[in-house]
Amino acid sequence: MDRGRCANMLKSLQRTLAKCQKSPSTKHWQCFKRNFTSIRATKYPGRSNSTFHYWPWFAASTLLATSLYYRDRPVQNDDKTDAFPSHTESIQVDSSVSDFPLTITALNFPVSTTFKLLGYGQRHVTFLRFKVYALGLYLAENDENLVSDTLNETYLHKYFLDVDDSKTPKENLARLLKRDDSKSVMMIDDLLDSGMRMLAKITPVRNTDFKHLKEGLVKTISKHPDVANNKDTLAKGLSELNDAFSRKGSVRKNDDLIIELLANGALQFSYHDSKNNEFEVMGVVNNQLVGKFLFSQYLCGEKSPSPQAKKTAIDKLITLL
């Protein structure tokens, strides 16, 4: 076989491998194996007529080794968000932005404590179905015990009548968190009232501006089911949010908005310019309803801005019960 045909076969193999890396379906891997078997059997005369050089076999072997590396690599794609790789330091939330760290500390972000990733997903604009930002929800490492301290057997029997006695308290609590929107709101709100510290990392997947980010936060907060009972207090809180979020201008794709829920219920906003790796603390909202309603919406209810992030976060919370 001549060099040109061998080169074309290798290019075909590379294209198939690229598809495998992007979408590791059974069909793509079967195609890769067929191409690999074909090219492995190929040989052609090298520069010396006295011997044969099996360079296609070696090249294909190299590609195969590379493919196995990527196939086994714990990279998370946009549609599979049900696992937290234990042996990596970050996870892919959306392929168009940088991976999200599994741990956020004061060494790399302007935060008050160490946070561990709780859940993650994307925010879509409903009527157009395009992605707006990647979202990571984090729980303070030292506050993990508050989950089981708050949502325990005593809590279950005190506030809920529809307890299935054939199931364990943990199974009953998990069922309420996952399947009953109204009760999950109550449970999450009680968790937040316990002083549980959280953090949200918002990373735009397209260029935007601070105005749009602020408007998105206000809309999310305003969808909490208890807004009607707290109009006056919340109005003051949203005024604080407007002052804390006074920065204007553009926010580039892959920059970060960091929202930290402090132990006293206040919210601290920080901005990360990823291109220059610069941080700015934008402001603080002391009104406790703003932070409570925002993170409650992230974690529960019918109108969460990212159902994907809500699901992964609730699944992780259940493991802490």
Swiss-Prot record:
Alphabetical list of SUPFAM superfamilies matching this protein: Chalcone isomerase
Keyword set includes Transit peptide: yes
GO molecular function: intramolecular lyase activity
InterPro entries (alphabetical): Chalcone_isomerase (IPR016087), Chalcone_isomerase_3-sand (IPR016088), Chalcone_isomerase_sf (IPR036298)
A Pfam family: Chalcone_2
UniProt KW Magnesium keyword: no
Transit peptide interval: 1-72
Origin: domain of life: Eukaryota
Subcellular location: Mitochondrion
First-listed, main subcellular location of the protein, grouped into a coarse class: mitochondrion
Name the UniProt record assigns to this protein: Altered inheritance of mitochondria protein 18, mitochondrial
